[in-house]
UniProtKB/Swiss-Prot annotation:
Transmembrane segments: none annotated. Its EC number is 3.1.6.1, 3.1.6.15. This is Arylsulfatase G. Ca(2+) binds at residues 44-45, 84, 302-303. Displays arylsulfatase activity at acidic pH towards the artificial substrate p-nitrocatechol sulfate. Catalyzes the hydrolysis of the 3-sulfate groups of the N-sulfo-D-glucosamine 3-O-sulfate units of heparin. GO terms for cellular component: endoplasmic reticulum; extracellular space; lysosome. The modification 3-oxoalanine (Cys) is found at residue 84. It comes from Rattus norvegicus. The gene is Arsg. It catalyses: an aryl sulfate + H2O = a phenol + sulfate + H(+); Hydrolysis of the 3-sulfate groups of the N-sulfo-D-glucosamine 3-O-sulfate units of heparin.
Amino acid sequence: MGWLFLKVLLVGMVFSGLLYPFVDFSISGETRAPRPNIVIILADDMGWGDLGANWAETKDTTNLDKMASEGMRFVDFHAAASTCSPSRASLLTGRLGLRNGVTHNFAVTSVGGLPLNETTLAEVLQQAGYVTAMIGKWHLGHHGSYHPSFRGFDYYFGIPYSNDMGCTDNPGYNYPPCPACPQSDGRWRNPDRDCYTDVALPLYENLNIVEQPVNLSGLAQKYAERAVEFIEQASTSGRPFLLYVGLAHMHVPLSVTPPLANPQSQRLYRASLQEMDSLVGQIKDKVDHVAKENTLLWFAGDNGPWAQKCELAGSMGPFSGLWQTHQGGSPAKQTTWEGGHRVPALAYWPGRVPVNVTSTALLSLLDIFPTVIALAGASLPPNRKFDGVDVSEVLFGKSQTGHRVLFHPNSGAAGEYGALQTVRLDRYKAFYITGGAKACDGGVGPEQHHVSPLIFNLEDDAAESSPLQKGSPEYQELLPKVTRVLADVLQDIADDNSSQADYTQDPSVTPCCNPYQITCRCQPGE
């Protein structure tokens, strides 16, 4: 075990017979008018084209497609960043990474997380009297006060980071494949640096590790059951509730086994997409059964598909980033091309959100924070600025106006982490830095700086294939506008009360339920 014996923090295991032993469902304080329950479901690495309602070629999302027909579908909805931790931090704070401090992903050994002076959506609603729960992927810090149990969630059940950041006994399908957890104390290591073999993937309930390694093949159903049970209990408490579900899907490894289990077959991805769709359907069915008239269900993706996983990655739909593919590399996850941050998104609230509506409003994950806070009758945290806006008028079909301007930060493909290198202005998009992420063929597009930005008209060129001619009147009219809005936001960020995340690493903070077992192995009942 080496350093595990000496350095890994021992996390005690407590197996409770009660599902929510630490959640207080009782009513306290004065009685208020009914406030909506909130269910946020965030898919992982799901492409815009993975939603059947978006892309006719997709036939595997019957529950989500039904939700789209019964609610609102957003076709110009964007992640706040193109990778996991920054996107999730922005969802929970309404602020870009340059403000909240989270500009790239946290590691298994990360000491820090989302800065503690940043206020999360769960903390705001908890203070407003909501009972709160998070189920699934967190990826905003797991050590000490960065754990979700200390960030506003009364209950937590899930994996603290991505489900490929630890070995398992049933490793599922990955590209390249990763081995199962070692069963002996040998020093063998997989030569692929993307595979984890030292420490098994942990499953938490509140502050306790309840399974390590987690059984990925049963994880989706566990998440569904915990979500359904929380909704059932919370709906009878007399208090409004917030449920945030961070899905393990569609991130590799894919754990389902379709009839023809060829690791290179798109059938694997489709089977996993169907499993995710079923999970979402179970949550929606429970909402419909116990809290239909007073619950907003908001579904979205955290970023685009992970193209380097080849056939185990999703579909960008028409947003193929052709200019970048001609330069090399992928225009999907980690990049500021549309395929990296334009994500599927749906809102469902019978009687409030109109039925079978497609919204073209320019929206972002950043907007969930201020919108939900407004619906809950709470107040935004003071002494800081927000990049998201209250879009409840859009949700209720009273407006098609969202943002006029969005900024897309570097998420690992080119440039400095978090830097605002791309500007969306109405139907136009300007790139000051371009670069491709690692593609299926292993290629990475070169980092290129554009003093005069590349500007694309997305209305005419969704594939981002041909930028405007720099000498054209259209380009010359746009250039000063783009330059000005970028300068304005950078000055606004400089004047803001911004945070800085701690990205230092220490092996001793690695989640481990039993450092005396190879890979920290322990199972329920041991």
